[in-house]
Amino acid sequence: MTQTSNSQYLVILYYQYAPIKDPQTFRDQHFKYCESIGLLGRIIVAQEGINGTLSGPEEQIHKYMDQLKQDPRFCNTVFKMETVEAHVFPRLSIKVKPELVNLSLQENVDLTKDKGAYLAPQEFLQALQEKDTLILDARNDYEYDLGHFRNAVNPNIRHFRDLPNWVKQNTHLLKDKKIVTYCTGGVRCEKFSTFLKKEGFDDVYQLEGGIISYGKHPETQGALWDGQMYVFDQRIAVPVNQKEHVIVGKDYFDGTPCERYINCSNPQCNKQILCHEYNEHKYLGACSDKCSNHPQNRYLKKHNNPNS
């Protein structure tokens, strides 16, 4: 389909826990529709619901949202929306998975039962300033390293599925505490806060709408957030705090303030590191000597053959 060059583009993030009896058929129909209206992005479909982020021209994004909400299961879906200059995804990917977000529990938590109470952005800001409240980041380590709420606890996990083990190893930190957890858009906290309640922690809360909603709220304006927010698209980093910008990221090599992520130039490693441009050139885009000397080093291929 054709688009006018002056179309405003939008990127949306959303999720909805709702039963999907035949995820594969749902996925196939969903892919066909998204492709037909020119949307790009990533969507996960599971028996427990849908979790997605898409980009496209404003008209097509609104068309998609209206179409999804016509399904009674998704009529209450909340979409977080931002304006962008163009597509922020290279392709459209819709996959069927066992869970929307993978906690790898032997028995999946029941999201229709007890879960962490929602805190609106204003309430979350108040919780951030409470002395005895534990603010727990439910995201991965590389997300935390780029930006996080001030004084938030960092579980230092590589994958969301590592959180349950971290909780079991750190019950002494959580016991008898008011626990407030947060993530990018809220989908991880829905499941994680339910897990915490199931584990016997009673005073559990979650940031409603995630970091994205908090940063855009007119009263909070992202206050007490330091750094930038990691996003899973071509932007990589987006601002949250509208009042001040405190850089917390540190260059992988020299520890200087940095908010620029690259992937290690060894395709078999691909580790994400915060790295200034001068250090990328110095270390051939790699995270180690071993990776810099790898025969498939992408940095060397690119600079030895600029047309490749």
Curated annotation (Swiss-Prot):
CDD domains associated with the record: RHOD_YceA
Enzyme nomenclature, EC number: 1.14.-.-
Domain Rhodanese, first and last residues per copy: 129-223
The protein's role, per its UniProt record: Catalyzes oxygen-dependent 5-hydroxyuridine (ho5U) modification at position 34 in tRNAs.
Record keywords, A-Z: Oxidoreductase, tRNA processing
Protein name: tRNA uridine(34) hydroxylase
InterPro entries (UniProt xref): Rhodanese-like_dom, Rhodanese-like_dom_sf, Rhodanese_C, TrhO, TRHO_N
